[in-house]
Amino acid sequence: MEGQAQPYPFAAVQRGTEVAPQAPFNFSRRYACDRCRGHKLRCIRDQMTVDSPCQRCRKAREKCTIGSSTRPVPARLNRSSQGHKLPGATSSASLTTAAPALSMPPQQALAWATGLGDTEQGDALHLSSVPWLDMFDSAMLDSACDSNHELDFADRSSGSGSGSRGAADDQDGPGDGRVHTITPTSQGTTAVANPFLPGHEFDFSPRFDMPGEQCNSDFEKDCTGAPVHAHLPADERSHVASVEFMHHPVAPIHPPTMASSHRTHSTASNDSSKDSTTGVRDACIQELNELSSTLTKDLHTVVDCKLASSFLFTRSNKGPDEYLFKTLDGSSSQESAIGRMLQGSEKFLDIMKRFNEPAQSAPPFVGLSLRVDAHDFGLLAEAVDGSKNSSEATQLDRRWRILHSYLERRNESPNPLSFGSWLGDNLTYGLARKPDMTAKAAVLLCYTNLLWIYETVFFVICHTLECSPSLAPAIKLPQTVPGLEINGFVLQNHPSLQIKILTQVSSYMLDSVEKALQNMLSDSTFQALLETVLQQEGLQYSPGEETGMISVRCLIDKVNKMLD
């Protein structure tokens, strides 16, 4: 019938017709998704295909659509459409056929486009993008296609001696043998009018992860009313049972180690713990950066004091106290160089203590939960295997009862630490955070500043004690030593006792810093950076002493010997 569009284009194609090879499609920039196009970013896709979301939308968990530009038809539709074009010319009425809505399902778009001409078919099949979550299931479409890629459901429903029964079951459905409207349901599945399935809705699991509570609730509603169909023959009963088994969402019956959708509770708790861990780490790095800037200023102060003490007994026109007092800033005693040195050490220890805390401690009921899950799934596997002597109806009923009881126990006490989440996400329980390069640089800067401050302060004290005639109470020490006047603690006219207290406190602080950096000092990268920085600044570094405290400890020991 030339000049008219055939209502059933698939029926006009002969069996064995060769399909013309499809030209490779050019994926250019105009096929970027709306989100990448709005931000003027490159739309990166896996294997250059638009059948899946791009990398940016998948990472941001946003819906990836191509609404403002054209997109190519999936390969399955192109394959079917090119093999079933109408022979002959099209009518003038088909040339003026209005385009369907932008959200038309792919099957309706295919049936509408086959009634157009060759030129209009190519333009009509390039429809705007349907949301990614509303796409039909590829396995269902492959099973509906015959060996010649034809969507022929009528032959399946009437074949193998069951033609009368298939026609009777499909009384209220259309009989044209084509796939009809696909509508997304409220549960996130897709309902398809399928003639060869009982009823007119076939719910299958979507390609995206569904929340565990929603899957369990829907699954329990179906389990409570699952019939056994004992009145049917054996072959029909097995067919109906297998179809009803496919009707239920498959996600809840898999072990937790095989599907990510069963780790909803654990994923939520893990996300919150990871967010808190990341927040603590970022806060520690920020505090380390602020502390390093403060210690750098303190280092400049004690360096000026070191330069002044080097000329302490070479200038006859100025006394030592007068010279050092004018060299240093006129700040209060609690803000002097030694006071800031000890306060900076205490602040550094506090930050490193929070940085070295374990990410999270393992709860005591982890082993119990693992044993319970293993026991439940062992019963499930035993029920699935079943005994060959028992009937199919008995095995099916036993499977549903075990599954139903297992889901009830999981819903009553949801375990955020399931077996899958424990193996996949919570391997860091009880372990300290592994520092990255940013944390290593911040710790290295604070640590080296502290070492330089301690080395400079004790160099000034040692030089003063060597050049002083005696330690009589009348002799005043340089301005840096009375820095022990912290929080009201002050020793007047007792410089030797004051220096002894300073050496004891400083030794304790250095030991605490070395203990806090035990994990960091064992890192090879941190060791290499520390060695390079210390050698550039002139501090001693030996392979047996990786902390770089040799110079400071030698000066402290020398001062203690002079005070004895």
Swiss-Prot record:
Polar residues: bias regions: 182-192, 258-278
Reported function: Transcription factor that specifically regulates the expression of the gene cluster that mediates the biosynthesis of the mycotoxins phomacins, leucine-derived cytochalasans with potent actin polymerization-inhibitory activities and monocot-specific antigerminative activities.
Chain segments annotated as transmembrane: none
Organism: Phaeosphaeria nodorum (strain SN15 / ATCC MYA-4574 / FGSC 10173) (Glume blotch fungus)
Residue spans binding DNA: 33-64
SMART domains on file: GAL4
Disordered as annotated region, ranges: 68-93, 152-197, 252-278
Keyword Transcription regulation attached: yes
GO cellular component entries: nucleus
UniProt xrefs under InterPro entries: Zn2-C6_fun-type_DNA-bd_sf, Zn2Cys6_DnaBD
UniProt lineage: Eukaryota, Fungi, Dikarya, Ascomycota, Pezizomycotina
Name of a matching Pfam family: Zn_clus
Major location (coarse): nucleus
Protein name (database record): Phomacin cluster regulator phmR
Keyword Metal-binding set for record: yes
Subcellular location: Nucleus
UniProtKB keywords: DNA-binding, Metal-binding, Nucleus, Transcription, Transcription regulation, Virulence, Zinc
Molecular function terms from GO: DNA binding; DNA-binding transcription factor activity, RNA polymerase II-specific; zinc ion binding
